[in-house]
């Protein structure tokens, strides 16, 4: 046997041991024997670098090189699931599927893992890329970190898998590993992770793959996607994937009746804490891929699936005090400080009280015994008070402040709103820092700066508003402690690059109350320049789809403030995009034609197809009518659109047909 064959045999043997240990829990060698073989392979690979293989089991460990996460577009959108906490919701889902399909169907019931969603792309049996959910359209490329998760195969078994496919699942932090790392963090005077989901998410975004490798994350796969799947059955596809080396839970049941579904949910609702990982419900999916395609999707979720969320656990503890926090928009949020208590596997010390109305409804007093639960097993909240246990003296009632806890400005409360606001946004420190953080965020200006750095700049007097970011010089930063020249240069370059961010994102970054991403896009389209928007009246604003009186008044109020107008003049002076760049038609091949885009696409994103339509003289519309010329259809086109298209005689075209039209 030559050296190459010996190395190949060792790799194959260790891959097999990894699979048996991490995926099917059937180890066949001791840890000592495994480590011995791994070291032998490492030694041979070091001696014969010409036989280096990126997919070798020795390459899972990672290295100390930091990497920035690239943004990757999903081939298929990573939709979120509709959810319910009631049997009524399950029955509604089941009956809706029954009515739409009007044929026999099977529901696959699976556990809902409480971790981080991941999309894995394989080509020719090799792991090509791993991407987080992100915003559902675009996610972070975390391939380097995912390679260290030992239950995810770098190279598949057998040869009966599709040449190119995607498989999705959940990265979880098993309870044993989670408890171990929290114990170590406490011993090292580090704050413990709040729960396994947060720990998994934080670990996956760590820039050091070696740290990820040491934390023993696990992965369960639950959906196969691709053009050439072996079976029409979701369940059968998962069983095939298990044979390729993927970890697929055996806790999955194909149900033909509503009673079977309820039995599955009841069983795991009772025994969920016996599992080695956190779960927060059960996912129901129509098993047939064909039927899934017929059912299609709504804006954010598939019609063919729903998540049943387990009811929250409730515990009793003591209220010690209440803090009132100031958010970036000036909203005052009361936070209860509690006697630490174990709730759903985590230590709870704080809970949101949301607003004054809730405090008054609870009749909250310091020292009260409170009933606390986690909404959806995530956010702690006080749901009640044990008034019988309240002392007859010494319990001080919790009263909402009349003045801002940060700047002492009298608070205001708008009509029909439950929140109180601090109106002093130009001088209130938490608002200033929050506004700058929002402005610099990825979805706005995408400036490479975090909350801690903004705090440092604020304390040094470098920033008091968003425009000040554009005045900071490298020399200013180098005067601060622990700042290297390279970091200072990177920050300043990031600020300069933000000047190319389009108008709609600048508008979103201004932080106008009630103006989120979608509203900012609509305003930018209706008013191509900031000057036009600044003089718009209520009537002009409310004629825009999706903009009501509340948003309109907020926009008008913002631009009626001289401080804001002065801020915008400064931003304009610094060269920010405060106008819409008019699109120039590349061609007029689609002139006079209207299109609706529906479904999931393989070659380009929906936004890219919309751009191609407009660049070739066509028009995108949002609703079907007899005047619509074409439906550009991908996978999972909605059944309602299909019915309407047939009624109106609208031509349905594929991606390839569309691309031929604009060649």
From Swiss-Prot:
Family: Belongs to the NAD-dependent DNA ligase family. LigA subfamily.
Cross-referenced Pfam families: BRCT, DNA_ligase_aden, DNA_ligase_OB, DNA_ligase_ZBD, HHH_2
Reactions listed under catalytic activity: NAD(+) + (deoxyribonucleotide)n-3'-hydroxyl + 5'-phospho-(deoxyribonucleotide)m = (deoxyribonucleotide)n+m + AMP + beta-nicotinamide D-nucleotide
Top-level class of the enzyme under EC nomenclature: ligase
PANTHER family named in the record: CHROMOSOME TRANSMISSION FIDELITY FACTOR 18, DNA LIGASE
Signal peptide limits: none
Protein's recorded name: DNA ligase
Chain sites annotated for binding NAD(+): 31-35, 80-81, 110, 133, 170, 285, 309
Biological process terms in GO annotation: DNA repair; DNA replication
Residues bound to Zn(2+): 404, 407, 422, 428
């Amino acid at each position: 046997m030559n050296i190459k064959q010996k190395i190949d045999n060792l790799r194959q043997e260790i891959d097999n041991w990894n699979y048996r240990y991490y995926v099917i829990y059937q180890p066949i060698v001791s840890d000592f024997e495994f480590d011995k073989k791994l070291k032998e392979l490492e030694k041979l690979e070091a001696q014969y670098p010409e036989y280096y293989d990126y997919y070798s089991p020795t390459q899972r460990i990672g290295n100390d090189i930091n990497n920035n996460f690239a943004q990757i577009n999903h081939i298929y959108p990573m939709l979120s699931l509709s959810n319910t906490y009631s049997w009524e919701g399950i029955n509604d889902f089941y009956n809706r599927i029954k009515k739409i399909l009007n044929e026999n169907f099977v529901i696959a019931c699976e556990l809902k893992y409480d971790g981080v969603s991941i999309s894995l792309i394989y080509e020719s049996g090799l792991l090509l890329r791993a991407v987080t959910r992100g915003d559902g359209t675009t996610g972070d490329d975390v391939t380097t970190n995912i390679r260290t998760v030992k239950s995810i195969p770098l190279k598949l078994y057998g040869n009966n898998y599709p040449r190119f496919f995607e498989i999705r699942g959940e990265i979880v932090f098993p309870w044993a590993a989670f408890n171990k790392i929290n114990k170590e963090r406490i011993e090292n005077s580090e704050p413990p992770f709040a729960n396994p989901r947060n720990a998994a998410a934080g670990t996956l975004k760590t820039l050091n793959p070696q740290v990820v490798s040491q934390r023993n994350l696990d992965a369960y796969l639950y959906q196969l996607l691709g053009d050439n799947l072996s079976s029409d059955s979701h369940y059968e596809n998962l069983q095939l994937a298990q044979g390729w080396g993927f970890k697929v839970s055996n806790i999955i049941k194909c149900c033909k009746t509503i009673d079977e579904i309820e039995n599955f949910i009841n069983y795991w609702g009772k025994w969920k804490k016996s599992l080695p990982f956190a779960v927060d419900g059960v996912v129901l999916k129509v098993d047939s891929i064909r039927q899934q395609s017929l059912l299609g999707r709504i804006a954010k979720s598939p019609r063919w699936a729903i998540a049943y969320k387990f009811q929250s656990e409730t515990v009793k503890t003591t209220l010690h005090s209440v803090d009132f926090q100031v958010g970036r928009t000036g909203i005052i949020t009361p936070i209860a400080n509690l006697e630490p208590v174990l709730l759903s596997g985590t230590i709870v010390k704080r809970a949101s009280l949301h607003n004054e109305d809730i405090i008054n409804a609870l009749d909250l007093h310091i020292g009260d015994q409170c009933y606390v639960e986690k909404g959806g097993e995530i956010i702690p909240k006080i749901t009640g008070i044990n008034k019988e246990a309240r002392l007859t003296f010494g319990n001080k009632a919790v009263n909402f402040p009349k003045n801002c806890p940060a700047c002492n400005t009298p608070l205001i409360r708008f009509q029909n709103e439950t929140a109180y606001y601090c109106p002093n946004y130009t001088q209130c420190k938490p608002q200033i820092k929050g506004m700058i953080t929002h402005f610099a965020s990825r979805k706005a200006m995408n400036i490479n700066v975090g909350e801690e750095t903004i705090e440092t700049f604020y304390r040094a007097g470098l920033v008091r508003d968003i425009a000040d970011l554009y005045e900071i010089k490298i020399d200013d930063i180098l005067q601060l402690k622990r700042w290297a020249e390279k970091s200072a240069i990177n920050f300043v370059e990031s600020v300069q690059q933000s000047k190319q961010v389009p108008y709609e994102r600048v508008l979103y970054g201004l932080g106008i109350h009630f103006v989120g991403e979608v509203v900012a896009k609509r305003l930018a389209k209706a008013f191509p320049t900031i000057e036009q928007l600044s003089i718009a009246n209520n009537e002009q604003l409310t004629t825009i789809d999706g903009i009501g009186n509340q948003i309109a008044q907020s926009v008008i109020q913002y631009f009626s403030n001289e401080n804001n107008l002065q801020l915008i003049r400064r931003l304009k002076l610094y060269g920010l995009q405060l106008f819409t760049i008019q699109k120039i038609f590349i061609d007029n091949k689609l002139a006079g034609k209207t299109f609706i885009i529906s479904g999931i696409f393989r070659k380009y994103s929906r936004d890219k197809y919309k751009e191609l339509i407009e660049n070739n003289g066509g028009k995108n519309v949002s609703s079907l009518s007899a005047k619509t010329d074409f439906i550009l259809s991908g996978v999972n086109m909605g059944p309602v659109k299909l019915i309407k298209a047939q009624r109106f005689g609208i031509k349905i075209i594929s991606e390839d047909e569309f691309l031929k039209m604009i060649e």
